[in-house]
Swiss-Prot record:
Primary location recorded for the protein, binned into one broad class: cytoplasm
Subcellular locations according to the entry: Cytoplasm
Any Pfam family: Methyltransf_5
Highest taxon listed in the record's lineage: Bacteria
Swiss-Prot/TrEMBL GO biological process terms: rRNA base methylation
Annotated EC: 2.1.1.199
UniProt xrefs under PANTHER family: 12S RRNA N4-METHYLCYTIDINE METHYLTRANSFERASE (PTHR11265:SF0), S-ADENOSYL-METHYLTRANSFERASE MRAW (PTHR11265)
Organism (species): Chlorobium phaeobacteroides (strain DSM 266 / SMG 266 / 2430)
NCBIfam families: 16S rRNA (cytosine(1402)-N(4))-methyltransferase RsmH (TIGR00006)
Protein name (Swiss-Prot/TrEMBL): Ribosomal RNA small subunit methyltransferase H
Length: 329
């Protein structure tokens, strides 16, 4: 598969192998530059499903949508690109299907979580401690709250809680104290390089600095974009949008995301057999999901060498085994 110049798709072969099984509506809820969407469309074409299928690509980043429109130009008749958040997957699917006279049920949904390589490499987005830029970190540039707002307004206790909760940072209190001291003595934390210097000053061990920087920047990014709340909403509504035997594939990159995804999938796969000792022959409620992958799929060494971002990626896939369900509106 030809690589996208904007975003190198992670685990693309596994995604298409487990997701593209029949014609229908496919949703890439985290479109990015269109790398995974292109892989899905090519898989549909190879299987002879393309003319009876539609791909809906969702992203809140205008630059990503522009890049994806170029990547998917060959398939413009069978793709619809929508600016939005993947937590709105139900309403977006409903609107697109209503416009086209289609039943609003998806054969497959993909969520590739985290920040794209392009966003990390663009200094002006403020996602990376390796790039000198503003403390922004907004996925959607139309949203109001930036990382600078959080760093410069939260008190020490709130900052420490944030870094520990979303970054699992063991030195969260020390880092928060250094940030507040800097604000009191110097003024506002104005950019990524200033924040990185404060963090390095709090964590003097050079062998630990990179992981500490990564955890703090991750925590801020999650808070700015409300990523975990958005993920929970997207998982819940996404499952409701699946057709019978439709599948959802989710790629996560850190333990907080993966725990949420795993917990949700496992819980939705369980059947309710009522109180212990009753000995019911049929469950009160059957699980709505089947676990296609009992354990997460990971990249092999070849892919990791070609695309280091794949090293931390975990792919989980489930299938809707419930014949009923609510349609998207």
């Amino acid at each position: 598969m030809k690589r996208s110049a904007y975003h190198e798709p992670v685990l693309a072969a596994q995604v298409t192998d487990f997701l593209v099984l029949r014609p229908g509506i496919y949703i890439d809820g985290t479109l990015g530059g269109g790398g995974h969407a292109l892989a899905i469309m090519r898989a549909l074409e190879t299987a002879g499903f393309e003319k009876n299928s539609l791909l809906i690509g969702i992203d809140q980043d205008d630059e990503a949508l522009h890049a994806a429109s170029t990547t998917l130009s060959w398939y413009k008749e069978t793709t619809v690109l929508v600016k939005g958040n993947f937590s709105d997957v139900r309403s977006i699917l409903g609107k697109v299907c209503k416009q086209r006279g289609l039943v609003s049920r998806a054969a497959g949904i993909l969520l590739d979580l985290g920040v794209s390589s392009s966003q990390i490499d663009t200094a002006g987005r403020g996602f990376s401690y390796l790039q000198k830029g503003p403390l922004d970190m907004r996925m959607d540039r139309c949203s109001s709250t930036t990382a600078a707002d959080i760093v410069n307004t939260l008190d020490e206790k709130e900052l420490a809680g944030l870094f520990f909760r979303y970054g699992e940072e063991p030195r969260s209190r020390m880092i928060a104290r250094h940030i507040v001291n800097y604000r009191e003595q110097t003024g506002a934390v104005t950019g990524t390089e200033v924040l990185a210097a404060i963090i390095r000053n709090a964590e003097r061990d050079p062998h630990k600095q990179i992981k500490t920087l990564s955890r703090v920047f991750q925590a801020l990014r999650i808070e700015v974009n409300q990523e975990l709340e958005v993920l929970k909403q997207a998982l819940s509504d996404g499952v409701d949008c699946l057709d019978y035997h439709g599948r959802m594939a989710v790629i996560s990159y850190h333990s907080l995301e993966d725990r949420i995804v795993k917990s949700f999938f496992v819980e939705k796969s369980k059947s309710d057999w009522g109180p212990k000792g009753v000995g019911m022959r049929e469950p009160l409620h059957k699980g709505v999901l089947g676990l296609v992958t009992r354990k997460p799929l990971i990249a092999d060494e070849k892919e990791i060498q070609e695309n280091p971002r794949a090293r931390s990626a975990k792919l989980r896939v489930v299938e809707n085994v419930a014949t009923g369900g609510s349609h998207a509106e």
